[in-house]
Amino acid sequence: MEENNGNNNHYLPQPSSSQLPPPPLYYQSMPLPSYSLPLPYSPQMRNYWIAQMGNATDVKHHAFPLTRIKKIMKSNPEVNMVTAEAPVLISKACEMLILDLTMRSWLHTVEGGRQTLKRSDTLTRSDISAATTRSFKFTFLGDVVPRDPSVVTDDPVLHPDGEVLPPGTVIGYPVFDCNGVYASPPQMQEWPAVPGDGEEAAGEIGGSSGGN
């Protein structure tokens, strides 16, 4: 009898769906960023990448000379051979990257009420800097693209998940702590490569294995 009573506890009546409280709407309490991009920003970028994925197999026309790309790849002493597909892939990737960055810069120009992008104008650097700052995937260009102080210090950075990073975070150096939270990057120190370290380590390993 005791066992039956214990088993009956697992079959308690469950509340119906009408009695359950509605789930909390978290998105209503989240503040919108003050520097939000224009409304057609996301659909336009999404349509662009959909079209690019559809034309990814079209490798007959190249925007960059393949011979120069191959020459740059061979300038690396660690590269011994370059396949025929590698320059084609890099050329297509560079073309897509430049078009994406140009579109983001132009959308920032439209947001500011301007309709021209001139190379000699100082606003060009501001537009490109804003495009690289507002997109998390372009943070690797932080050391290449001239940074606009107004964009870097005043505007926080959007995380891919929609979170806003602290204003003190330096663009181009994403740093995570043990909890996955962004933190201020430490001072980066470049250590010069010492020639012969790899050979000496290999010799020590070979000597120890030979002695055994």
Swiss-Prot record:
Region (Disordered): 1-23, 190-212
Summary of the tissues where the protein is detected: Expressed in flowers.
Gene Ontology, cellular component aspect: nucleus
GO molecular function: DNA binding; DNA-binding transcription factor activity; protein heterodimerization activity
Record localization: Nucleus
Main location per the UniProt record: nucleus
Keywords: Activator, DNA-binding, Nucleus, Transcription, Transcription regulation
UniProt xrefs under InterPro entries: CBFA_NFYB_domain, Histone-fold, Transcr_DNA_Rep_Reg
Composition-biased stretches (Polar residues): 1-10
Gene3D superfamilies membership: Histone, subunit A (1.10.20.10)
Alphabetized Pfam families for the sequence: CBFD_NFYB_HMF
Family label: Belongs to the NFYC/HAP5 subunit family.
Its biological purpose: Stimulates the transcription of various genes by recognizing and binding to a CCAAT motif in promoters.
Oligomeric and partner information: Heterotrimeric transcription factor composed of three components, NF-YA, NF-YB and NF-YC. NF-YB and NF-YC must interact and dimerize for NF-YA association and DNA binding.
PANTHER family: HISTONE-LIKE TRANSCRIPTION FACTOR CCAAT-RELATED, NUCLEAR TRANSCRIPTION FACTOR Y SUBUNIT GAMMA
UniProt protein name: Nuclear transcription factor Y subunit C-7
